[in-house]
């Protein structure tokens, strides 16, 4: 259910600010978004899986906190990231 190593590596290379950057808010938000999107399909098939739903809610909250941080630091990077990921904020 989790992202494969190849998928993670592709996301990191797409959103990194510099070579080897894995901790920037953009990379973290992109990884969380990919995990959240993958879990959405799981919940369509397994609607009663409440333990995984708790993990999903935790990921959504973490992504929201990172987006709020990025919005406070640099609004242009925030806007670009939201546009790229297709988030509604």
From Swiss-Prot:
The keyword Transport does not apply. It comes from the Bacteria. GO terms for molecular function: rRNA binding; structural constituent of ribosome. Pfam families: Ribosomal_S15. GO terms for biological process: translation. GO terms for cellular component: cytosolic small ribosomal subunit. InterPro entries: Ribosomal_uS15, Ribosomal_uS15_bac-type, uS15_NS1_RNA-bd_sf. Keywords: Ribonucleoprotein, Ribosomal protein, RNA-binding, rRNA-binding. Gene3D superfamilies: 6.10.250.3130, S15/NS1, RNA-binding (1.10.287.10). Part of the 30S ribosomal subunit. Forms a bridge to the 50S subunit in the 70S ribosome, contacting the 23S rRNA. Belongs to the universal ribosomal protein uS15 family. One of the primary rRNA binding proteins, it binds directly to 16S rRNA where it helps nucleate assembly of the platform of the 30S subunit by binding and bridging several RNA helices of the 16S rRNA. Forms an intersubunit bridge (bridge B4) with the 23S rRNA of the 50S subunit in the ribosome. This is Small ribosomal subunit protein uS15. It comes from Pseudomonas syringae pv. tomato (strain ATCC BAA-871 / DC3000). The gene is rpsO.
